[in-house]
Amino acid sequence: MKSFRKLLHYLKPYMFFAIIGPLFMVLEVAMDLIQPTIMQHIIDVGIANRDLNYVIKMGLLMIGAAALGLVGGLGCMMYSTKAAVNFATDIRKDVFAKIETFSSENRDSFGTGKLLTIVTNDITSIQSAMTMTLRVLVRGPLLFIGSIIIVFVTARELFPILLVVVPILLLAIIFIASKASGTFKKVQEALDKVNTKLQENLSGVRVIKAYVRQKYEITQFGNVNTNLTKINIRAVQLISLMMPIIMLVVSGGIVATLWIGGEKVFDGTLQVGAILAFINYLNIILMSLMSISMVFMQIARAFPSADRVQQVLNTEVDITTETNAVAPKRIEGQIDFKNVSYSYTKNNEYVLKNISFNICKGEKVGIIGSTGSGKSTLAKLLPRLYDVDQGEVCIDGINVRAYDLQKLRASIGFVPQKALLFSGSIEENLRYGKEDATNDELEVAASSACATEFINKLEDSYQYHLTQGATNLSGGQKQRVSIARALVRKPSILILDDSTSAVDAKSESNIQSALRTEYKGTTTLLIASKISSIIDADKILVLDNGELVGDGTHEELLEQCEVYQEIYLSQGGNLHKEGGKEHA
């Protein structure tokens, strides 16, 4: 409840809509409340006295009241919906903006599936609760209180029936609502698991098909889906239990009304119209209590969602720009790692252990090692995708923590292992690297990445539309566009994290040549699993089990580093450097 209350400040800009909507609802409620009384007069006066003119006059009054009620209902729906939708839109906007500031560790702590559920289902649940609050939470109590007052004034003889029926209805609704509210939190948690499994399958569909694991994945999805179904059924059963109980109580009230009211009619102390009006008001009370209970159900469902939204909004982002941050006009690109250690789990299981090295401005440095040796992790420390646990990472002699974060990252071109392109044109993807890049700059970057040839062959060239995940490009094409996107910003530091693994040997050689000539002032880190990709680097760093075990040129490492020798032999053992070219 506290979390939901904290979100109410998002409603402030839309208070006009939030106030005017319920005011329209007051009009609708007033019209609903007078209709049973009008019907009572039609029966007791018009029909009893056979006064057709009176019946027509009161009938027209009923139609007018219904029309006014319709206007009130439509006005309430329009303004309340505007308030609730804008309220939810602003929350969603802030949640998304907060997620965008998350470090990799922050995102890992939530998981992609949970974040997707929060941004979609949870905020939608909060929106529904707000809509029902503005529309129904005003209508329900007004109908309830108004009906009781009218019955007390016009049919006091039948009022004791309400004193019995209403408390029973309230107790039944409160009991069922309290039981159901705890189930909704479990529903959201189960939905998280379904979303996570679905997201994994959609992103890994090629692997699943390649290994013929569709049946296994269907079974796994079936398990989490069945769990969600069971919890949903439990929640629905509790809510469904409400209607039969309420109808039973109300039916008992109607029977009591007909019994007691019938005797009063025979005695001449009550008229038939009053009994029918009382039954109508009893039904209005029933509907008002049901609507109030549904609002509280929805609010109870929104409380866990609000908790999860607040969990995102209140998350302390662990990688931010520090006070008095350094923002030089240009970062030169000298890199120093000083006794750097890092652990993903923060339990002293370090994936990088006491790493120290230095790279001069403009050097081309290869980084190699077996799978899991820490190559990619090391590269992610430079743009502060993660922060070190021990030691320092310095650029131009300044700790990366001291830099303005945007300035630091704008000076680094990062090409990850998996080429990630966004839906849209190739040009839009290239401009992701530099929004104000000229067409000439785009073409130079594409040419350096050996992407020009295939781009020009596409139907719309640079305007060629990429599908989600760029599935309409090959792996090598995606990697080349990804490299071009990094090059277009002319970075001080370029990180290629095994970014040419799907590129043919000739294109890879041309890319390496372009890096040596067109970007010779750029400090370049070439992370690779193949020696052939880094053999011409100014120096090579060798990682093994998170430790730096080699630092030197290809020839020096062949003589001095046992791990490098093993990698060299495993890849043919006949590579040599001659005239800047690689031979086998």
Protein language model features and the residues they cover:
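Membrane-integrated ABC transporters
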Residues: 1-34, 39, 47-61, 72, ...
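Transmembrane helices of ABC transporter permease
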Residues: 13, 17-30, 62, 69-71, ...
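An intracellular "coupling" helix at the cytosolic face of ABC transporter transmembrane type-1 domains
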Residues: 13, 80, 101-105, 121-130, ...
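ABC-type nucleotide-binding domain
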Residues: 328-584
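Helix-loop-helix
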Residues: 51, 55-57, 150-164, 234-308, ...
